[in-house]
Design a protein with these regions (language model features):
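Non-heme di-metal
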Residues: 1-233
Length: 233
């Protein structure tokens, strides 16, 4: 499938804020890794009869928890305390758009998971590629560079699981039809994701929107399937 999941780039103002407030960024990133593992486990509990899904997401959950350990260790190395932060708006806005009846609920859960992983991949890339001296502390930038490929794999895994579900649930008879169905629904959810990730936001989080005034430019895709190509976990 030739999909372009993200409909708007991360605002430059968010990147600047992330550099300025990197201790808070790390704290929320640690929370995000735990939430990602929790999401995978929730899907395993919701659909235990789907053996491929449970096997794949079991591995993904373990990897997300290893990432949490890496972030937590880095925070300790940097002398940063653990911060309790209330959730941002990003995930809740995506959840509000998901359908509640099967087989569409499962499809939307998988596609929203793909979008979140794609946004994480994009932000890791942006932060890791900043010039030395103008970006994050070197250990933080190095960790984000290392994590980018994992987020790409997770994005692709969620998409593959969604495509398989579309066929097995009878939403599409052939793979090409499943791809078209997924592309349509992914594009719909991507508009909501882009608004949450780019519109003015009063809180700073790993997936928050622009911290300054201004309207987001939601339009052409900015991150394509080829940018996220990587081996499956």
């Amino acid at each position: 499938m030739d999909l372009a999941p993200l409909r708007a780039p991360t605002p430059p103002a968010w990147v600047a804020e992330a550099v300025r407030r990197w201790p808070e960024l790390l704290a929320d990133h640690a929370n995000c890794e735990k939430k990602a593992a929790s999401t995978a486990l929730a899907l395993m509990f919701a659909y235990p009869e789907d053996r491929e899904l449970t096997a794949r997401l079991s591995r993904l959950a373990r990897e997300e928890l290893r990432h949490f350990e890496q972030v937590d260790r880095l925070m300790q190395d940097q002398g940063l305390p653990y911060l309790r932060q209330k959730p941002g708006r990003y995930a809740s806005r995506l959840r509000a758009a998901l359908r509640t009846h099967e087989p569409f609920r499962k499809l939307d859960l998988l596609l929203s998971g793909a979008l979140i992983e794609a946004r994480s991949c994009e932000r890791f890339r942006l932060l890791a590629s900043l010039p030395e001296g103008a970006g994050l502390p070197a250990p933080v930038a190095a960790l984000y560079a290392a994590l980018e490929a994992s987020e790409a794999r997770h994005y692709q895994l969620y998409l593959r699981l969604a495509e398989r579900h579309a066929q097995e649930a009878g939403l599409a008879e052939r793979r090409a039809e499943a791809g078209a169905l997924i592309a349509t629904r992914l594009a719909e959810l991507a508009v909501i994701e882009a608004e949450a990730a780019t519109s003015p936001d009063t809180e700073f989080r790993f997936h928050s929107g622009e911290p300054a005034a201004g309207e987001p430019a939601v339009g052409e895709p900015v991150l394509r399937e080829s940018d996220l190509s990587a081996r499956e976990p």
